[in-house]
Amino acid sequence: MNLISIPAFQDNYIWLLADEQKHCVIVDPGESAPVLAALSQGQYLPQAILLTHHHNDHVGGVADLRRHFPEIPVYGPQETANKGATIMVTGGDHLSIGGQNYQVIAVPGHTLEHIAYYSKPYLFCGDTLFSAGCGRLFEGTPAQMYASIQQLAQLPDETLICSAHEYTLANLKFARFILPSDQDIATYQQQIMQLRAKNQPSLPVKLQIERKINVFLRCDDIDLQRKIGVISPPNSLVSVFSELRAQKDRF
């Protein structure tokens, strides 16, 4: 499989996953022009569009893409029904597109009906899990978002996190503020600074790395808890996550 990140807007990524026959799926096309350019350049044949949630920077290109490809199915949660989705899916569904299987995972938090698509090893998680961070809570609760990212954290180490935004450096800056002595975070920050200086994407990233450098996946860390002022037992970490997310919002 060939995974392509298509830059859009200021910091979005639209994902394109293609097989050897050049058949591809398009994930979260916030605008159509860069997608059409990538399809033309690579001579790819789109088989489906996958939507993770209803925000315009993820769905804005659907209508125009459907004008170019009238028969293309557009999968998405119910909240995307009026944003161009033609087939509604929900957590627990399984899709087969061009010989590639996708597991639909419900990940409420950023929005109430947000979903992710997992096709081993690729995880298209929209605005739920970012490299070194997680999405803002526009509709859901901290408990929902924490449960969602914990669910994603159970996937295999080799899972490739395909987030929808290039937020990694900003997230690592916050992570360094929370855990200034953490060597894994410090080292990774330097690596990503070098990548971004060359205008190269920081994504996808292996889940194995995220477990080390993403503070939202480390709510059980006692140093982190002391830093944010919320000490909590391992079986009750939502309060830690909630305060951590609030501090990131203010950072």
UniProtKB/Swiss-Prot annotation:
It holds the Pfam family HAGH_C. Pathway: Secondary metabolite metabolism; methylglyoxal degradation; (R)-lactate from methylglyoxal: step 2/2. GO terms for biological process: methylglyoxal catabolic process to D-lactate via S-lactoyl-glutathione. Binds 2 Zn(2+) ions per subunit. Its cofactor is Zn(2+). Zn(2+) 2 binds at D57, H58, D127, H165. InterPro entries: Clx_II_MBL (IPR035680), Glyoxalase_II_hydrolase (IPR050110), HAGH_C (IPR032282), Hydroxyacylglutathione_Hdrlase (IPR017782), Metallo-B-lactamas (IPR001279), RibonucZ/Hydroxyglut_hydro (IPR036866). HAMAP family: Glyoxalase_2 (MF_01374). Belongs to the metallo-beta-lactamase superfamily. Glyoxalase II family. This is Hydroxyacylglutathione hydrolase. It comes from Yersinia enterocolitica serotype O:8 / biotype 1B (strain NCTC 13174 / 8081).
